Amino acid sequence: MQGYSLLELAQQIGATIRGNADVIVTDIAPLDKADNNQLTFISNPKFREHLLQSQAGALIVTESDIEFCSAQSNLLVVKDPYVAYAILAQYMDSTPKAAQGIHQSAVVSDTATLGQHVSIGANAVIEDGVILGDNVVIGAGCFIGKHVQIGENTQLWANVNIYHDVKIGSDCLIQSGAVIGSDGFGYANDRGRWIKIPQTGTVIIGNHVEIGACTCIDRGALDATVIEDNVIIDNLCQIAHNVHIGTGTAVAGGVIMAGSLKVGRYCLIGGASVINGHMEICDKVTITGMGMVMRPITEPGIYSSGIPLQPNKVWRKTAALTLDIDKINKRLKAVEKKLAE
């Protein structure tokens, strides 16, 4: 296992060193479990009580955390330990690539264009007219349809399916089982008979985008479904046709977005939320978990819906009252009218 000196790590995050700059750590571990060969961090002051007992070889802390540490501790002092942790986790990352080189069982069209140092895993299929940028990694069993373009340094884990004409930017990460560019849910109804509408648009994904396992992003009906730069989408999400997600937005697991929804920049969408289509959500909106969004949101802020978990007996009473809310409202108005007389 590779070792890293405190000096080397400090240079990556612009940290001030307190202690031995030559100490070597091999990886990162939780505060309460790190040993003297490991680096740890504290991102919340409520955990300061654990600093004195920490056995870590080095700690990432803020200036205000120092007084809670042992005098013998080796410290990397920064403004934001969590951001520093994220940067160092990338720097020290030992996750293997999804593929190394081009496997002999991969099927690559003669008309595909491959950049330098492209890797393609076993049984992957690269169809006609595909363009793969430098250092692209295509995992085992992936399908890359006709005329797909994938930018440099993007990695697809095993069994990702990218349909024809999709464009994916650089430095993206797509987890296993994701499907990008499948047909949107477009049909016309002729007296009870469904007529399928061919989805002739595409999907355009920007740079530095991450897409979670088994997430589906449908192609547009006529125009493109668009995911802008620096968007992160968790597992098991459904992004319908012609959705547009703005820069810097984060989408947690299990979210469903209906067609032609426009989500602004720097939004946070909580897990299992369901959002109606053909409307807009403005920039810097937070929707808490299991939110049901039926109308446009025009003001930045935090929005919630749904009933938090209750004991079953309490919930049943609440549900019963909800069914009678119209009757209760009429009785209340009648009482108010009498009192006003």
From Swiss-Prot:
The active site is at 241 (proton acceptor). Keywords: Acyltransferase, Lipid A biosynthesis, Lipid biosynthesis, Lipid metabolism, Repeat, Transferase. One of its GO terms (biological process) is lipid A biosynthetic process. Gene3D superfamilies: 1.20.5.170, Hexapeptide repeat proteins (2.160.10.10), MurE/MurF, N-terminal domain (3.40.1390.10). It comes from the Bacteria. It catalyses: a UDP-3-O-[(3R)-3-hydroxyacyl]-alpha-D-glucosamine + a (3R)-hydroxyacyl-[ACP] = a UDP-2-N,3-O-bis[(3R)-3-hydroxyacyl]-alpha-D-glucosamine + holo-[ACP] + H(+). Pathway: Bacterial outer membrane biogenesis; LPS lipid A biosynthesis. Pfam families: Hexapep, LpxD. Its EC number is 2.3.1.191. One of its GO terms (molecular function) is N-acyltransferase activity. GO terms for cellular component: membrane. Belongs to the transferase hexapeptide repeat family. LpxD subfamily. PANTHER family: UDP-3-O-ACYLGLUCOSAMINE N-ACYLTRANSFERASE (PTHR43378), UDP-3-O-ACYLGLUCOSAMINE N-ACYLTRANSFERASE 1, MITOCHONDRIAL-RELATED (PTHR43378:SF2). Homotrimer. This is UDP-3-O-acylglucosamine N-acyltransferase.
